Amino acid sequence: MFTGREKELQYLNDYYEKSGTQILVVYGQKGIGKTTLLEHFVEDKDCLYYEAISCSTRQQRVFMASHLGDMGISMPEYPEFEELFSVIEESKGSKKILVIDEFQNMCKTDNEFFEALYDYINREDKKDMFIILCSSSIGWVENSMVGKLGALSRMLSGFYKIKELKYQDFKAHFPLFSIEDSIGAFSILGGVPGLWQYFNDEFSLRENIESFILQSNEKLFDYGQQYVAEELRETAVYNTLLGALAEGKHKLNDLYRHTGFSRAKISVYLKNLMQLEIVEKVFSFDTEGRDNTQKGIYQIKHPYVHFYYRYLFPNQTKIMFWETDEFYDQFIAPTFKHFVAGCYKKVCQEFLERESALERLPEKFINRGEWVGKKGNIDFIFQDEEEEILAGICNWEKEMLMYEDYQLFMECQESAKIKAEYIILFSAGNFDNRLREEMKKNPKLALVSLEQMG
């Protein structure tokens, strides 16, 4: 099922229509849907697709020649890149597209591929092509690639990052889930469609976890650790840090006390994890109350990596010997609502962004964020050009949002030194009567239930 990528598809088509040879780097995390997007883009076009693997440059050329041979194109056994490019451009018809998937494997050892590509695109007699260089190595593309290529990077036409899909796309993909199970499943799989294939909305969320995560023969069983190991060495160190973060050790000092690693070492490894978008540093919305915020907070950003290190990583032995239903009751059920709560905040923020795009909010908001205080949090702050603010909280864990929670929110406003012109309180549970009465008296206060979010 191809969903939620209409904007990306249009972007590629617009690039294709440009005159001259274009070289576009398309990148994003593994499973984000890059290959599926490209398959839809080239389905009515003249395209050669090749997936590079980790090997020598000479072997890479041999594999490319073999691929062309399978298409009925005669090639020498050990061709040069120049010969490969020449054969590709000789095809008749519309503008040729060359897609090199996981192209970082072509150039991490040397620049021979890019040097040959540079020579090709500067030939006077060349035909126009659209060359797409695709990669799952986010950290390498954003932090190392240009330095590795040097002056050769100037031939690149642009970079296009494929981001996670939204909750609404996830919900459309799994229409049979209840809204509670839908948000819970999204907190595990996130907006990574490559992971969606492993869940089935004909079953409950619990049944999906027990059947497709807690079984040692299933792909998701050790996917979290495999995902980390693909990009990083010294996995013992990274596993320890991720396990500590998943356990709730979010500050540098907490990680230092828990792991025994030096602060300098922890900082370096956290930086590497952030470059790969596995971990993120939490920043509060900038207000006059910055002295009342918590600083230096780190958390796991990748949803499935978070779930894996929270529930599977510390309980490997128990998973192997306990029945799955017993394991779920003992180790997942007691804290799962708290785990989902962070995702629910993002779903609420996405709802507000959608309402804003449809002009259903009182103002057009241009800045947004959250405020993490020492005595309480403001889950979202939206600010317009006139610096008017819409803010609120998102309750997932409590069965009922109480008037006292509203009062705490108002105290957090004072600590943040802001005054929200509009307040929205989201709750997966009910609202108490006092809150409902307050809403009747205050036209700038709104209460939003799960059902109202659609």
Annotate each predicted stretch with a short phrase.
Residues 44-50, 54, 58-76, 89:
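Conserved NTP-binding/hydrolysis module of P-loop NTPases
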Residues 20-38:
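Walker A/P-loop nucleotide-binding motif
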Residues 352, 378-402, 409, 423:
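Conserved catalytic cores of phosphodiester-cleaving nucleases, focusing on short active-site segments
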Residues 424-454:
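Domain-level recognition of nuclease-like catalytic cores that cleave nucleotide substrates
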Residues 91-113, 117:
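Conserved P-loop NTPase "ATPase switch" module shared by AAA+ and STAND
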Residues 25-27, 109, 119-149:
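Sensor-1/coupling segment of RecA-like P-loop NTPase cores
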Residues 142-238, 242:
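Interdomain motor-coupling "hinge/lid" segment immediately C-terminal to the ATP-binding subdomain
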Residues 201, 207-375:
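Accessory nucleic acid-recognition modules appended to NTPase machines
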